Amino acid sequence: MVXWTDXERAAITSLWGKIDVGEIGPQALARLLIVYPWTQRHFSTFGNLSTNAAILGNPKVAAHGKTVMGGLELAVKNMDNIKGAYANLSKMHSEKIHVDPDNFRLLAEITTICLAAKFGPSVFTPDFQEAWQKFENAVVSALGRQYH
């Protein structure tokens, strides 16, 4: 279990309230597929992923990015039991989809980059980033739990 300070909880909740999952999610997933092209193997049913432009314009990438980002709400609402909240997702990604657990870390890093670019230093301050990184690390750990 992660021990959260009141300031960290407030930062994560505040930042989450500002996030448009329909904007950040597709952006983050598209960047993942472009920057780390080996991750595309999990998305063979998404159609054309042959170029950066194809990935950025792919409606299935956008829809799944929104779903993935929206899934973080589960962690925001269950900050005291993220591992329990993500148990089924972890099992699915481990046993059914066979996602390399390092991909969760890569997506978390890219999500942080997207948030920093979107909100800038006046909102995404070092304190907010510190809390967000701690939150993302907890999510990554929870998603990778079934791999151990």
From Swiss-Prot:
Coiled-coil region list: none
GO BP, sorted A to Z: hydrogen peroxide catabolic process
Annotated keywords: Heme, Iron, Metal-binding, Oxygen transport, Transport
Positions with a binding annotation for heme b: H64, H93
Residue span(s) of domain Globin: 3-148
Gene Ontology MF terms: haptoglobin binding; heme binding; metal ion binding; organic acid binding; oxygen binding; oxygen carrier activity; peroxidase activity
Tissue-wise expression: Red blood cells.
GO cellular component: blood microparticle; haptoglobin-hemoglobin complex; hemoglobin complex
Alphabetized InterPro entries for the sequence: Globin, Globin-like_sf, Globin/Proto, Hemoglobin_b, Hemoglobin_oxygen_transport
Function: Involved in oxygen transport from gills to the various peripheral tissues.
Subunit structure: Heterotetramer of two alpha chains and two beta chains.
Membership in a protein family: Belongs to the globin family.
Name of protein: Hemoglobin subunit beta
Organism annotation: Decapterus maruadsi
Chain's gene name: hbb
